[in-house]
């Protein structure tokens, strides 16, 4: 029997994204221009840090304070402040806007439970931990989120080039017709 499962990660048939054994794949376009014999690359600044997103999504266990601290350490000062002064519903709504897809709705209640417990505080091995204490102990002072090349995940059965152009256009606001594609080069992998 023929399988109609298509993986949005590796682009192969036979399995779905959540069962893919390949590393998570993002596809993008690296745009550059030559200016006075110097190459200049177009990069974008993320709206939110990866640490902030993973923290709000509840992608940690409450007994792993070291990992929670590492998420806090890669957040901006403003993000840390928001965690202390806003409730979960506002933070979640600001993170996703009106684009909360079904894929994130399932983790919202679990993430909220963790957030509320962390804000109130709890004991691990007779030591009290809460969000305020963890943030106070953070030594990082990031002013802005990470910068990177515009990229994202492919849609169902989308080819790499079309995905890269779509993501580039969505994240930069430029029309994809404003660039020339260089062909016959190997893709960049990090």
Over which residues does each language-model region extend?
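Conserved Nudix-box catalytic region and its N-terminal flanking loop in Nudix hydrolases
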Residues: 39-166
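Short beta-strand scaffold segments in enzyme catalytic cores
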Residues: 27-31
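Cysteine-centered loop/knuckle micro-motif
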Residues: 17-21
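Short Cys/His-rich zinc-binding micro-motifs
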Residues: 4-15
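Active-site-adjacent beta-strand/loop module that shapes the phosphate/pyrophosphate-binding cleft
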Residues: 177, 185-190
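Short secondary-structure junctions
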Residues: 172-178
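Short strand-connecting beta-turns/loops that link adjacent beta-strands
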Residues: 34-38
């Amino acid at each position: 029997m023929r399988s109609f499962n298509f993986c949005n990660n590796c682009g192969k048939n036979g399995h779905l994204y959540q069962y893919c054994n390949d590393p998570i794949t993002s596809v993008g376009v690296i745009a550059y221009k030559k200016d006075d014999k110097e190459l200049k690359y177009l990069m974008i600044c993320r709206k939110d840090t990866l640490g902030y997103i993973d923290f709000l999504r509840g992608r940690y266990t409450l007994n792993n304070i070291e990992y929670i601290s590492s998420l806090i350490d890669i957040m901006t000062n403003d993000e840390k402040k928001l965690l202390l002064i806003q409730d979960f519903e506002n933070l979640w709504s600001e993170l996703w806007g009106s684009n909360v897809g079904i894929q994130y709705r399932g983790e919202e209640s679990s993430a909220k439970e963790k957030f509320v417990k962390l804000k109130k505080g709890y004991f691990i091995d007779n030591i009290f931990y809460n969000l305020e204490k963890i943030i106070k102990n953070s030594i990082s002072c990031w002013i802005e989120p990470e910068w990177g090349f515009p990229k994202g995940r492919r849609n169902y059965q989308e080819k790499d080039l079309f995905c890269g152009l779509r993501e580039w256009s969505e994240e930069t606001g430029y029309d994809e017709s404003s660039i020339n594609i260089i062909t016959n080069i190997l893709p960049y992998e990090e």
